[in-house]
Amino acid sequence: MSQQPLPLFGFDRLTLGLYLALVAIGWLMIFAVNYNPEAPYAFFDLSHMAGKQLAFMVICFVMMFVVMLSDWSFWRTLALPLYLVSILLLPGTLLFGREINGAQAWYHIGGFTFQPSEIAKFGACLAMAAFLSSPGIDLRQWRDRIIAFSIFLIPAVLVLLQSDTGSALVFFSFLLVLYREGLSPVLYALGFGTAALVILGLKFDPPSYTAAWLIALVNYLLINRLRERKRLWWAVFVALIPLTIWWMYPLRWLLGELEVSLPEEQMHLLVLMPHILLFIAAFLPNYWKKNSLIQGQMRVWLVLLSLSVTLIFAANAFFNLLAPHQQQRIKIWLRPKEAASEARGAAYNLLHSKMAIGSGGLLGKGTLEGNMTKLKYVPEQSTDFIFCTVGEEQGFVGVIGLVGIFLWLLWRITILAERQRSNFSRIYAYSVAGIIFVHLVVNIGMTMGLLPIIGIPLPFISAGGSSLIGFSLMIAVLLKLDSNRNLA
């Protein structure tokens, strides 16, 4: 018996309802941030932030209606052309775009601005789904891996050239999709390990102490494998711990007695010497064992340790090459004491963001009653920091409710993904879920100081037509594909 399509507009009503709820909450929060008691109905004015958002909401609803009237196969057939068009829009901002908050990522059209990276995310979802669902694709093959990575790395690099680090980071959400489709977990372990080493290199300055503790950890593992004179080995290992902590005091005294002057950087590097010597002494007895398997393991350890130490120093050196405002954002996240002296800028934003969220208490101050919202203590509160308004006016209960709706939506999208008969539809659904998830985690994390301030909107909530159109288009196509799942 042939499969029949679901009735016209037989879309998943729960997903649509969650989408509409988030859009409505977002508009209410934007209205609250920009509320003026002297002009309570200004939201009908397109010069008002809430008025603009209302206009974009109407555009999105019309767009979703048009998508539901389209043929479901249209989106797979034109996946590559739509992706290429979205990619071609990105470099144009470097020539014809407008710079906002240090990022030249917007086109200015009439009285509105348009951010092509939001559409590029949608295009990348289609392209990734089309590629991975093609016959013969196997992520165990390096050729297919390279193509899959290129699909999201190309727009990520182009967006990074616009100085929009936050939007570039979002494209790495496709790693979640690739994991679901069978990419080796070993690559993710290496990726997370690399990220951890980079964070350590950025957090601790000078990096020589971080490298010293890393070598000490490897020394512990090496000594634990030895069988002879273990007490002597452990005695030396334990003695190096206080020496690492207080190394600079005896070193400065010794150099003073010898009347030798060294730059501060070189003095810090000397802390590595005893750990390196112990590593060599513990490494050689393990390597000399007449066992090819053990020798192979030792070589791997040596290579990984060398790369790890190099990466720590490289991350620290890269930090020193960043622009001052980029360094400040990292300091706010990883070195808060060092950044505490900043009265304005990112430190100011984060301080007042946390104050606004905390001042809401359990139940919040009430809609339109947020003092910090009214007095504009937090810049960009309609866009990147709109979560502060939720925390201040709706309190802990409101925050939990909003996050709960997001998690419910993500859970529902995964349900839709798993019930698809088409690989294209399933992969597309997971791509959409991954992008929303990364936006949610990064936006809330940065407003609470858990992640660096990189400036990405909260989906469906933050003001901005490009963001709302991009996410609405993702949801609309998902609903369309799901409503025709019986045809796959």
Question: At which residue positions do the language-model features occur?
Answer:
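A juxtamembrane structural motif centered on a specific transmembrane helix
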Residues: 1-3, 236-245, 442-488
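N-terminal membrane topogenic signal
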Residues: 2-19, 50
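Glycine/serine-rich anion-binding loops at beta->alpha junctions
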Residues: 111-123, 161-163, 361-366, 453-472
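Long extracytoplasmic/lumenal interhelical loops at the membrane interface
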Residues: 342-344, 357, 361-394, 424
